[in-house]
Amino acid sequence: MSIRVNPNIIPDMIAGLAQTQQQLNQADQQIASGRTINQPSDNPAGMAALILNHGVQSQTDTFSTNVSDLQDRLQTADSALSSAITAVNQAISLGVEAGNSTLSNIDRQAIVSQLSGIQQQLVSLANTAYGGTYLFGGSLVETTPFALDSISPNGVTYSGNSSTVSVEINDGATVATNVPGDQLFLNPSGSLMGAIQGLITAIQNNSGISAASVTLGTAASVFNGERVTYGSSLTQLQSMGNFLASQQTQLATQENNIDAADLAKASSNFSQASVAYQSLIEAEASILKLPNLLTFLQ
């Protein structure tokens, strides 16, 4: 009696082993990476969705970094301006004190010395830098904006420009990152630097002290009005930061829904594939009466 042998048995066995080996590899990759998609062939549609998701995540991360850096930058600027207001309020009080007609020349000279110190403090604050760049020089961030100048009516010279700088914090959304130094400290509606210098000159001449003090008060109000820009920008950044954080969470959840592996299931698949692979080896070796099919395949 003759035995008929399937002429395709060897190709079929090799194909079966290859398929089972692929299942083993796929389960092993899922366990190692925690992901179901480790190469495009695993899930072409899922891979396309992941690429899109990762692109949006990258852009969102960039915007989030911009927001965080800008918050630190604007908080540094606003803190400097707050210190400037404190110094100016002290100068206003000194101006009121200097208006007392009973003061001696020595007393007034002492007040002038204090005001000169405040003037120097204001210049230092106006030259505040963050991350190696100046905050109040307009777009000339590498140029020291202010310097004391005894000849200038304002008592200082300004080497910045009048440009504002905006940064994108989301698609189509930008925020102003600065108020130029001349708009803050040399505003035509009330020059803070000019008013300080004017008060110093008035006290030195013992003339017009009261008017100079009023002028300084007006300049301080104008300065405070310009400072509001920083508060508004910080509020906008806080809101955008919250939105971007929420978006990052949503994108991470979306990525997991597309790609996260069920590790328990992957481990089960690996075990099942291992058993199936070993069974195929043994069964096919028995059919071919070979001690080890792998030896044949080699």
What are the roles of these predicted feature ranges?
Residues 1-142, 201-298:
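Amphipathic alpha-helical polymerization modules
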Residues 144-205:
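Cysteine-poor, low-complexity segments in flexible/peripheral regions
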